[in-house]
Amino acid sequence: MCCMASIDCLPDELLVGILSFILTNEAASTSILSKRWRTLFAFSHNLDCNDSIFCHPRKNKRKSFRYFLYKTLANLEGYSRIKKLSLKFDEKSNIREGHGKLVVNHWICNALEHGVSELHLCFEYMGWY
């Protein structure tokens, strides 16, 4: 039952619109609110991801950014269109390690398959030439 002040009374389309204004990492944290909220962030048309949220002294925290973004892109509904993909990597990022460049390329290709119209990539100094 909905009360007049409850955010749960809002239609999914409006909630997805609201979630599209915050970082995808933060929008994903709303999935703990209820079963209804579990997948709402994945319907957002704007994916704005910043790996500094995941950059932690422990390496496995940094790898969790790769996993989070991989799962987010993989779980997009087939009909979902991405308007904007924004990826920000800071100097502490481990994206240079191992297959990092291939992973970023995969994310970009996946976004292109979903019709991305804006692509923002920010690599703070990483020593790449």
Swiss-Prot record:
The lineage of its organism: Eukaryota, Viridiplantae, Streptophyta, Embryophyta, Tracheophyta. Gene3D superfamilies: 1.20.1280.50. InterPro entries: F-box-like_dom_sf, F-box_dom, FBL60-like. Coiled coil: none annotated. Residues 4-50 form the F-box domain. This is Putative F-box protein At3g42722.
